[in-house]
């Protein structure tokens, strides 16, 4: 099956693009997308436990099975924004 993988933040920096199409066998969990990314770019290991998964615009657990033509997002932690501290 083929899925579209969308990259943000550290993942986009690692791949130098915002998305790729990857092939996986049937009955593959979404966590395999992260495993492939870490295998190809080992320094992404630091984000393994902090990354969330999205499939077709919904947050999912790491054990959710992929389906052909799914759109997968690896969501690393984000920072920034406004501080609520007035110091």
Residue ranges and their predicted role:
Residues 1-87:
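Ubiquitin-like/PB1-type beta-grasp interaction modules and other compact soluble beta-rich domains
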């Amino acid at each position: 099956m083929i899925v579209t993988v969308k990259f943000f933040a550290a993942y986009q920096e690692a791949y130098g693009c915002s998305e790729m199409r990857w092939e996986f066998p049937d009955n593959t969990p979404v966590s395999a997308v992260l495993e492939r990314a870490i295998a190809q770019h080992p320094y992404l290991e630091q984000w393994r436990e902090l990354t969330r998964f999205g499939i077709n615009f919904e947050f999912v657990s790491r054990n959710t099975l992929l389906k052909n033509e799914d759109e997968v997002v690896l969501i690393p932690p984000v920072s920034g924004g406004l501080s609520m501290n007035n110091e």
